[in-house]
Amino acid sequence: MKRIFLTAMAVFAVSAMFVSCNKQESSEDDGTKYALFFNYGTKSHVTSETPVLSDILNKAKELTVEADIALYGGTKKKDPFVQELSAKTEKDAKAEYNKLVEKAKSKGAEIIAELNKMKEENAAAIAEYPKDMHLNLDFGFMLLKYTPEMISGEIVAETDCGKFEVAGSKEVEE
């Protein structure tokens, strides 16, 4: 009787483990993936006649790539703006996202401070640019969910990491 009970318990434990494994596999097999982005949106009117603004924009790109590498531990060989997570569930992805948010905010602040330094150093040249010559950057951090069927992903969470603005101030005569 004891042997039958132990055998039944073992079969139950193995079948429960098998069912649990199958449930995990099915959630992994649906193709849902999560990715983190630290990036910026830009609104600008920058031309070859505004080299300082072009330099600032190029510096913003460079610093953002460096920030992505620092945040995710990637390399310049990979696309640093798309950091796929190992998380298979939205809950796990959000937990990883929350760990990186504070780091991303401080990276955004560092980038904005560096760009403001460039803005101050070049204030005289920028003042000579027409008013419509401008550069506005919005730094942000996003958690994106996507499946093979999606053309673009669904934003699950996002955090604003700061803004940078610079514009010429010269009145243009018409």
Predicted regions and their residues:
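General helical structural elements
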Residues: 6-7, 98
